[in-house]
């Protein structure tokens, strides 16, 4: 195992193939959500149901992403990250093909839940292996750059999905997702190292419960995990609800819908690139503080503009773009601080983080949907602002200890 770790840290071609293939799998699972969302308007027409099912597809997907987090992280600690990750890539491909057999919206939503379980493998297994494979400053840069590749999904997904449903049946998207996952499997099979530290230990449910209890008793971890969830919630609520807001609510075309995503996710990528440049030069706490201003300020602009004029969707887009830059700058460092706030094995810690975040996303997207149904764009963006303010309060509590994140890259 030491040979694996040392060779990985040297960042050779084989070592770089591992994060590239992991991000290909991540891209497949993300585009499995972002590309299908504009296509959901065609899906609900196929099954003869109303548009309230559009965001529910994403809710089911993220609920699946929470379902097995508690097990996969500790399981990969004990039997190895590599076999668990490889099974995950094959599982996602299989569920993407199985959804082609559905004949009702209920069956479709159930399959979306089962597909969402594939998200569990990214944080609880894949990213834990990344964190264990590279030294800290290099790891933050790799994580930020990997995020840029993964973020092509929400940048291109809406455009590609809107174009796809005009040219091809929506079912063909899932064949594409399966093909990408199988390609990632081949690369991971060749290049993924084994980094698990507790291999061979027996998996005991009582011991597992004790591990999670110890993790959740850590206040810094709890604040960081909740903050990670509330930081990304406005973005995910936007992805889920924006087809209805833009196409049905504002009466714009699917092309306009896709183009309105470009500044938001373009700024998210710019924030990640800025983070990659500053990482190692600035303390992590400073990077988080720098990201706080555009995050909260952007959400405030979106809320104020749409409360003043319900159809100010360009101001809403501008505010969300500013917010997206902030989250790109702050989130990778926050994830790192939270993951290493506990001395427990990283598979368990990462799984606990994932469950907390996915619970916030699953519940929050549904709350955001009803906020829009009851109060339109203003209420939806006010909900997002509240999420941002909760993030700010949690960050303030987490960074109360002046030593947390003080060293550059730590």
Swiss-Prot record:
Cytoplasmic side, ranges: 1-15, 74-82, 131-144, 188-226, 277-286, 335-346, 397-410
Periplasmic side: 37-52, 104-109, 166, 248-255, 308-313, 368-375
Primary localization class, coarse: membrane
InterPro entries linked to this entry: MFS, MFS_dom, MFS_trans_sf, Sugar_transporter_CS
GO biological process: response to antibiotic; xenobiotic detoxification by transmembrane export across the plasma membrane
One GO term describing the cellular component: plasma membrane
Keyword vocabulary terms for this entry: Antibiotic resistance, Cell inner membrane, Cell membrane, Membrane, Transmembrane, Transmembrane helix, Transport
CDD domains: MFS_MdfA_MDR_like
Membrane topology: Multi-pass membrane protein
Example of a GO MF term: sodium:proton antiporter activity
Keyword Transport belongs to the record: yes
One Pfam family in the UniProt entry: MFS_1
PROSITE patterns: MFS (PS50850)
Family: Belongs to the major facilitator superfamily. MdfA family.
Physiological role: Efflux pump driven by the proton motive force. Confers resistance to a broad spectrum of chemically unrelated drugs.
Protein name as annotated: Multidrug transporter MdfA
Organism: Edwardsiella ictaluri (strain 93-146)
Organism phylogeny: Bacteria, Pseudomonadati, Pseudomonadota, Gammaproteobacteria, Enterobacterales
Name of the gene encoding the protein in the UniProt record: mdfA
């Amino acid at each position: 195992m030491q040979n694996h770790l040392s060779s990985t840290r040297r960042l050779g071609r084989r070592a770089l193939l591992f994060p590239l293939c992991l991000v290909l799998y991540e891209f497949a699972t993300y585009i499995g959500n972002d590309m299908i969302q504009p296509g959901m308007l065609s899906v609900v027409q196929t099954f003869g149901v109303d548009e309230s099912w559009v965001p529910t597809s994403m809710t089911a997907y993220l609920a699946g992403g929470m379902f097995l987090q508690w097990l996969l992280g500790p399981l990969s600690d004990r039997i190895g990250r590599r076999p668990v990750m490889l099974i995950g890539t094959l599982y996602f491909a299989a569920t993407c093909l199985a959804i082609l057999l559905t004949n009702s919206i209920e069956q479709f939503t159930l399959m979306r839940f089962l597909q969402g379980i594939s998200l569990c493998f990214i944080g609880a297994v894949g990213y834990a292996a990344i964190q264990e494979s590279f030294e800290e400053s290099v790891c933050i840069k790799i994580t930020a750059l990997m995020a840029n590749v993964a973020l092509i999904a929400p940048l291109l997904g809406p455009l590609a999905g809107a174009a796809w449903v005009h040219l091809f049946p929506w079912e063909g998207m899932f064949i594409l997702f399966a093909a990408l996952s199988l390609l990632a499997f081949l690369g991971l099979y060749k290049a993924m190292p084994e980094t698990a530290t507790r291999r061979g230990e027996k998996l005991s449910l009582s011991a597992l419960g004790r591990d999670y209890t110890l993790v959740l008793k850590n206040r810094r971890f709890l604040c960081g995990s909740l903050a990670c969830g509330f930081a990304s919630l406005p973005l995910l609520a936007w992805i889920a609800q924006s087809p209805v807001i833009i196409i049905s609510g504002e009466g714009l075309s699917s092309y306009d819908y896709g183009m309105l995503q470009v500044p938001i996710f373009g700024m998210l990528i710019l924030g990640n690139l800025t983070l990659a440049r500053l990482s190692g030069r600035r303390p992590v706490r400073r990077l988080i503080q720098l990201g706080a201003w555009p995050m909260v300020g952007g959400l405030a602009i979106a809320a104020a503009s749409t409360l003043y004029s319900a159809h100010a969707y360009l101001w809403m887009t501008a505010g969300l773009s500013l917010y997206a830059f902030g989250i790109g700058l702050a989130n990778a460092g926050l994830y790192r601080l939270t993951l290493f706030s506990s001395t427990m094995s990283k598979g368990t810690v990462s799984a606990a983080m994932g469950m907390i975040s996915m619970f916030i996303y699953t519940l929050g997207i549904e709350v955001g949907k009803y906020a829009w149904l009851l109060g339109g764009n203003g209420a939806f963006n006010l909900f997002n602002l509240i999420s941002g303010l909760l993030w700010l309060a949690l960050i303030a509590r987490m960074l109360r200890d002046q030593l947390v994140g003080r060293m550059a890259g730590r």
